Amino acid sequence: MKAGIIYNEGKPLAVELAAHVRRILELQGWEVHMATGIGGILGYSRPDSPVCHTPIDQLVPPGFDASMAFAVVLGGDGTVLSAFRQLAPCEIPLLTINTGHLGFLTEGYVADLEPALDQVLRGDYTIEDRTMLTVQVLRDQTVIWEALSLNEMVIHKEPLTGMCHFEVDVGAHARVDIAADGLILSTPTGSTAYALSAGGPVITPGVAALQLVPICPHSLASRALVFSNSEPVWIYPANPFKHLILVVDGNAGCYIQPEDQVFVQRAPYRARFIRLRAPEFFHVLQQKLGWGLPHVAKPRAKKSTDS
């Protein structure tokens, strides 16, 4: 039996808990492999060296493979995103424990760790699959950069904000011209992140959709677009200035030159979340983002007793 641990090495609590979880598992006969969240951070390229290419399948840490029953993630949302970039190709289900701040993507808190681990070891859990994206940058019809994304891909001007022009092909539909500070291409999971702040809708996780959200568009008619996740997307920068920057899940970036093309499609891999209770997305929205809460106290609606 093999299990894994991914932890945020920059947080002393996560480091301490990782060692604790390892001891618990090894005492029960599990083979345990550990890796840090930094392994899923792709880093940023530089204008004078715009290519920083790590193939998707080369991010899998040593010892982690498809035979692993599960892995425990100890950190915040950034560590969860990093863990899935590393482990999604192996389809390892992850138990996510929040040692960070918001923890929108985590299943439990530190106080829940040991009961949650016991529940997983008993096999008393379900798995929720989430859509991921494959993001590729092509230059002269050759892939020069790629990454997995659970939340979103963003393209904007670098280093200052300013109007950008894009031509976008969604599936076989007519090409769309967009003038905006940038573009966000988001999964349903990412619809509660940057896309939400940019005015995009919240999409429940089970919907087979993606969304394209312009950032501060220079048009009253330019709005977020929701479309089937089976449709690939091509983005062509149409800008007189030299560089744009492409960012995946807030931490991995690649400079985009005017002749480059960006190709995004639903990834062949899934983010597999271990759920200890039936997922209730609206409850998470209320708890984490304050959505749907009453502004004033009001009496409950009563069922009519009239015949």
From Swiss-Prot:
Q: Mainly resides where?
A: cytoplasm
Compartment annotation: Cytoplasm
Keyword hit for DNA-binding: no
Enzyme Commission (EC) number: 2.7.1.23
Q: Name one GO molecular function term.
A: metal ion binding
Pfam families reported for this sequence: NAD_kinase, NAD_kinase_C
Question: Which residues are NAD(+)-binding?
Answer: D77, G78, N151, E152, D181, T192, A193, Y194, A195, L196, S197, N251
Q: Relate the protein's function as given in its record.
A: Involved in the regulation of the intracellular balance of NAD and NADP, and is a key enzyme in the biosynthesis of NADP. Catalyzes specifically the phosphorylation on 2'-hydroxyl of the adenosine moiety of NAD to yield NADP.
Q: What is this protein called?
A: NAD kinase 2
Which species expresses this protein natively?
A: Thermosynechococcus vestitus (strain NIES-2133 / IAM M-273 / BP-1)
Give the classification, highest ranks: Bacteria, Bacillati, Cyanobacteriota, Cyanophyceae, Acaryochloridales
